[in-house]
Amino acid sequence: MMAEEHTDLEAQIVKDIHCKEIDLVNRDPKNINEDIVKVDFEDVIAEPVGTYSFDGVWKVSYTTFTVSKYWCYRLLSTLLGVPLALLWGFLFACISFCHIWAVVPCIKSYLIEIQCISHIYSLCIRTFCNPLFAALGQVCSSIKVVLRKEV
C-alpha cells in the first residue's frame, strides 16, 4: 500500500514538472523585459516645451500609436508566436543537449588530463625557478635605497 502511494506521488511530481501552470496575468514573473522593452507612447514620442502640437493631434496620435502597437503585436504574436516558440524550444534543447553531452564531458576530460601535466609543471617550477628566484632574492637583498629630499 505504501509503495503504491509513493509511486503515485512520483508520477504526480514528474507530471507537474512538464505540465506547469502558467500565470496569464503576470507574463514576465522574472522581470526579464523590465529595462529592455519599454515602448509606451511617452517613451518614444515627446514634444519639448514651446513646440506643442494641437491637443487633439496629440490625443489622436497617442490613441493611434497605442492601438496600432497593441493590434500589431497581437497579430504578429498570433502568426509567429507558436512557430518561434517551436524554433526557440528546439534551439535551447540543442544547446542543452550539447552542454550536457559534449561541453561538460570535454571540460571534465580536460581537467583530468591537465592534472597530470600540472604535477609535472609544478615539479619543474620547484626544481628550476624556486632556486633561481631565491638566489636573485639573496643578491637583491643587500641593495639599499636612500631617499633624500634636496631643497
Swiss-Prot record:
**Result when mutating residue 141 to R:** In LQT9; increase in late sodium current
Instruction: Select a single GO molecular function from the record's annotations and give it.
Output: transmembrane transporter binding
Give the bilayer topology.
Answer: Peripheral membrane protein
Its annotated function is as follows: May act as a scaffolding protein within caveolar membranes. Interacts directly with G-protein alpha subunits and can functionally regulate their activity. May also regulate voltage-gated potassium channels. Plays a role in the sarcolemma repair mechanism of both skeletal muscle and cardiomyocytes that permits rapid resealing of membranes disrupted by mechanical stress. Mediates the recruitment of CAVIN2 and CAVIN3 proteins to the caveolae.
Q: How does it assemble?
A: Homooligomer. Interacts with DLG1 and KCNA5; forms a ternary complex. Interacts with TRIM72. Interacts with MUSK; may regulate MUSK signaling. Interacts with DAG1 (via its C-terminal); the interaction prevents binding of DAG1 with DMD. Interacts with DYSF. Interacts with POPDC1. Interacts with CAVIN1 and CAVIN2. Interacts with CAVIN4.
Primary residence: Golgi
- Domain of life, per UniProt, equals Eukaryota
Q: Which residues lie on this side of the membrane: Cytoplasmic?
A: 1-83, 105-151
Which family is this sequence assigned to? Answer: Belongs to the caveolin family.
According to the record, the residues making up region (Required for interaction with DAG1) are 64-114
Q: Which UniProt keywords apply?
A: Cardiomyopathy, Cell membrane, Disease variant, Golgi apparatus, Isopeptide bond, Limb-girdle muscular dystrophy, Long QT syndrome, Membrane, Ubl conjugation
Pfam families of this UniProt entry? Caveolin
Protein's name in the database: Caveolin-3
Q: What is the effect of changing residue 78 to M?
A: In LQT9 and SIDS
| Tissue specificity comment | Expressed predominantly in muscle.
Q: Which InterPro entries match?
A: Caveolin (IPR001612), Caveolin_CS (IPR018361)
Q: Has keyword Transcription? A: no
Query: What PANTHER family does the entry give?
Result: CAVEOLIN, CAVEOLIN-3
The protein's PTM annotation reads: Sumoylation with SUMO3 by PIAS4 may reduce agonist-induced internalization and desensitization of adrenergic receptor ABRD2.
Q: Where is this cross-link: Glycyl lysine isopeptide (Lys-Gly) (interchain with G-Cter in SUMO3)?
A: 38
Gene Ontology annotations of biological process type = actin filament organization; calcium ion transport; cardiac muscle cell development; cardiac muscle hypertrophy; caveola assembly; cell differentiation; cellular response to ionomycin; cholesterol homeostasis
Q: Does the entry feature the keyword Disulfide bond, yes or no?
A: no
Disease per record is:
HyperCKmia: Characterized by persistent elevated levels of serum creatine kinase without muscle weakness. Rippling muscle disease 2: A disorder characterized by mechanically triggered contractions of skeletal muscle. Mechanical stimulation leads to electrically silent muscle contractions that spread to neighboring fibers and cause visible ripples to move over the muscle. RMD2 inheritance is autosomal dominant or autosomal recessive.
Spell out the subcellular localization from the entry: Golgi apparatus membrane; Cell membrane; Membrane, Caveola; Cell membrane, Sarcolemma
Q: Which residues lie within the membrane without crossing it?
A: 84-104
